[in-house]
């Protein structure tokens, strides 16, 4: 998917309207608790400012449901960005309207302003054409650098592209397309996918799309129990999607028919209850006690999966191996993160599809050992499903 990028345009003297993902966590005092998303947008922001562009930033924050919600103002974000850039950031009171427009027109080369939360207007998520047109009038060139919302057809991601002469991808989206796109279109082999998470229903489309592309799939997370039930095993009180057992059988048959190695765990860490202080035992998957539930992959599985990971040249990971929020059941997920970092050190390309897997890598302190950690959980999942992302499709080719 070749899209025009920030590198293809001249910003000098132009009003550059950039959609960023500044949906950062705030504490009760309105203080930003993690500014990673702001830092990730800095390369694109600096590119515009250093080449003499007049930058107008827009983002959403939280879920104000189309109403002005003072505690979800982007003002704290503008302050933090100002510190990071060591320059003033003009904060608008709205994202459209006469006052915001006058502030945009008053910008000089190398200056930056932040529009107020897009989702204070219900028209944003409805992709309202009039609202999109009004946003578009703020700038002369549109840059989308918000991969996390690229799978949403909103006014600031999709609608706006119909009303600006030039719309291009920022550096963050360019990087996402390069790694995720290449992994799916032209991977170095062996190509291995690791899929975790609680439910098969959330991963059906990913599995379907990956069956045409990968050599090996490793399965973890609670969805393994629906597969085991489909194979006739007793799984104790483990989570099972009863209505997906037939589908699990079908997926196992499909993998076999396509000659794909689809590995399921050999053992699990079982617990008497879903709790940190529950009694636990390591058991083979054919001997899960009927009063216990599996909450993580076991040591034999960790060993097998780690060996598979070290054989691969391209690795995509989406979803944890167990209930990694509870330390007692985080071992499998953290071990997979370490194996991924080891494989990367040996020259493999490792890609993590945002969300919980990314959180696990951060928890293990291994983010610098991974080739690419996607900035969008839902967007990367839809990309892996082979779906077109509206916010990217709308950009200039």
Curated annotation (Swiss-Prot):
Coiled coil: none annotated. It holds the Pfam family PGK. It is an enzyme of class 2 (transferase). The keyword Transferase applies. Pathway: Carbohydrate degradation; glycolysis; pyruvate from D-glyceraldehyde 3-phosphate: step 2/5. Its EC number is 2.7.2.3. InterPro entries: Phosphoglycerate_kinase, Phosphoglycerate_kinase_N, Phosphoglycerate_kinase_sf. Keywords: ATP-binding, Cytoplasm, Glycolysis, Kinase, Nucleotide-binding, Transferase. Gene3D superfamilies: Phosphoglycerate kinase, N-terminal domain. It catalyses: (2R)-3-phosphoglycerate + ATP = (2R)-3-phospho-glyceroyl phosphate + ADP. GO terms for biological process: gluconeogenesis; glycolytic process. Substrate binds at residues 21-23, 37, 60-63, 119, 152. One of its GO terms (cellular component) is cytosol. Monomer. This is Phosphoglycerate kinase. It comes from Prosthecochloris aestuarii (strain DSM 271 / SK 413).
